[in-house]
Amino acid sequence: MGAMAVVHPSRSGEIADPPAWERLAAGFVLFMLTGALLAPVLAPDQSETPILRLTWLPVYALTAGLMALRFERIIKAWPAWLLAGLLLALAFASKYWSIDPEVTQRRVIAMAINTSFALYLGAVFRDSALPRLLMQTCLVMAVGSLIMVFAYPQIGVHQADNAGMWRGLWYEKNQMGLVMVVGAVSAAACLAAGDRRPWTALIALGLCSLLVLASQSKTSLLCLLLGSGFVGGLWALRRGGAVLTVAGLWGGVLLAGGAAWIWFVDSAAVLTALGKDPSLTGRTLIWESLMRRVAERPWTGYGFSAFWGRDSVPAAFVRQETAWPVPSAHNGWIDLLVQLGWPGAVAVGVVIAVAVVLVVLRLDGMGAREGYWSGAYLAVFLLLSLSESVLLNHASLPWTLMLAILSRAVIFDAPQKSAALARAPSEAYGNRLRIASDYVNGPARRRPVRLL
């Protein structure tokens, strides 16, 4: 009998779940990227202090060590490195026309290091390992937020503006809400991927969702519904077969089309129904003022991370026109326009589009193994970019995870290998299988054993 072979799924050189110490190190960097605890304690007025900058030095050293350790792995994401490198080059070049070149240069360096960590994260934490890491990290921060709310309410609960609303380990309730959305969506993805510890995922999903509600952030609530609905919908379609899949896709297209039509026809009524000010709490006034600043420098912007400085003249015009100390554009795309102009906005849009296309094309493979986390997070990220400044940031969790998705999407799984089983025994040492007709005198019979 010839050799037999069976196909075993194998990912040569890939790590499905890195060791505990590496998960702990990566989780610490993610914790720092959320701006939790240290920033509110060391800089309660939200200013950038020298002490706060020093806290990032261990993060940068840790990132360098992780990069060196996994260099052979992360270099496989070279298309993502090229795309991210182009964005970094554009941001660095903007220092030559920036209204605050020192800040631009310093933050480009910080963004380069954190971009490296993002690409490492996507290349090393494959399949469900990344949503599991995010779920565990956010679960720890959720417990920490509860401690702050009940033990140290002066930090964990808003005292002046938005008094009584929970903010946990962060400056603002929206920050807590968005981090908890990441935790909840990651927990849902772990459940959809068949995580080996479903109870941990269920606890994380429940606690993170509870904190989203406690933050009373409507943007976070919409993101939670979108992300968890994306994961749950695709999981149900995959389990339901072809008929349910086709029906679900058609239903999704009709629902999305209907929602878009209602929004364009009467967006004010939609916002009123959601309990939101039709002017988006004055944000439309901010956007109108900012677009006038964009018209003054449409091709260059005012320099990466330079527009919102305390001594910024164009930002002072915006604050004067809106009669409000505006901290940001509250829109990722407009914020990008005032920093890098239309070239920067188009470049970032192309990078995000590449990530979206790759994730959609790999939904049946990578998507199923990770519990559809990448697609769900991209949907949340795109929605979030319309109301928060989350694009091309030098140190933020949303942009880091977007780049991590790009990194994991450009690395294709290693081909399956065939592992040969043991060869059949030779004629000298083994007997081949026989059937009844092989015996000359008919089927072999055994005499019954007789007991005395």
Language-model-detected regions and their locations in the chain:
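N-terminal signal-anchor transmembrane segment
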Residues: 2-69, 88-97, 381-383, 440, ...
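A membrane-periplasm/extracellular boundary helix in multi-pass inner-membrane enzymes
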Residues: 147-152, 214, 232-278, 291-296, ...
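Long extracytoplasmic/lumenal interhelical loops at the membrane interface
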Residues: 271-288, 292, 296, 300-340, ...
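Aromatic-anchored transmembrane helix interface
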Residues: 55-59, 80-87, 101-123, 133-138, ...
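Transmembrane alpha-helices of multi-pass inner-membrane enzymes
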Residues: 374-438, 452
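Alpha-helical transmembrane segments of multi-pass inner-membrane proteins
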Residues: 60, 92, 116, 131-162, ...
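Hydrophobic transmembrane alpha-helices and their immediate junctions
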Residues: 123, 200, 229, 241, ...
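A conserved mid-to-late transmembrane alpha helix and its immediate loop/hinge
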Residues: 209, 216-218, 321-359, 383
